[in-house]
Amino acid sequence: MEIKQLKISDIHPNMLNYFNRYQEVTQCWRRNENNWVLEDVSYIRDWDENKKKWAINYFLQCIEQGGMIIGAFDEYNLIGFAKIDGKLFGSLNQYINLSLLLISNEYRHKGLGSRIFVTVCEKAISLNAKKLYISAHSAKDAIAFYKKIGCKDAQEIFQELIDEPNDWELEYELCYSR
């Protein structure tokens, strides 16, 4: 398995052919006044061909605008990826946005998300970020992943980065070696 930063030449129309976005969501966190409560839900998150085409264009746009796509490959198949924007923001320009981190269904719960996250952190540090900003989908599994790796509630909230009304705004403090 290889994890690498993608270049424009790595992006092609068939790159998501084997990527399986399928996810059954049975519980999500919802904000109730000042607390988060777990609620039962029932829906499927998946990508059709149009959504995959959209994602490929999104990858190209990201790279062209100075951001990064980190891809994980099994042989030649893209099985996981993350997207970080290329510009700093926040009151002290301390944040960089991690706007996507997805693992193909067959490869989840095997440590791949954590491995990609480590690479994301290294790349964010190279861009002089102090923290990752994550507007996370509120699915129980997604929040459990981010909390397990050390994410905390975001100290600053950026409404323009919230994709869905129930997203949980998180941050991760990056570690700089001395």
Identify the meaning behind each predicted range.
Residues F145-K147, C151:
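Conserved active-site tyrosine of GNAT-family acetyltransferases
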